[in-house]
Amino acid sequence: MPKLKTRKAAAKRFRATGTGKIVRRKAGKSHLLEHKSSDKKRSMSKTTLVHERDELNVRLMLPYL
C-alpha cells in the first residue's frame, strides 16, 4: 500500500500533545492589535484544543500525527 500524503498546510498549523490531543493557535493575533485589550491579546497567544467535531478532519489531513 502506498504511503499517505500529509497536507502540509495542516501540518504547519496543528500539533499533537503527549496524550494524543490536537492543539492549535488562536486566530486574530496577526494585525489590527491596537484596539484590542492586553487581556484579549494575551489570551489569543495561548494554544487551545481542536474541537472534537473537527478532530477527525484534522487527523485525516495528518495521517502520521
From Swiss-Prot:
Keywords: Ribonucleoprotein, Ribosomal protein
The keyword Membrane appears for this protein: no
Recorded GO MF terms: structural constituent of ribosome
Recorded coiled-coil stretches: none
PROSITE patterns: RIBOSOMAL_L35 (PS00936)
Any GO CC annotation of this UniProt entry: cytosolic large ribosomal subunit
Ranges where the record places region Disordered: 24-48
Pfam families, sorted: Ribosomal_L35p (PF01632)
GO BP terms: translation
Compositional bias ranges of the Basic and acidic residues kind: 31-42
Top-level taxon of the source organism: Bacteria
HAMAP family, alphabetized: Ribosomal_bL35
UniProt record similarity statement: Belongs to the bacterial ribosomal protein bL35 family.
Protein name, UniProt field: Large ribosomal subunit protein bL35
Gene field: rpmI
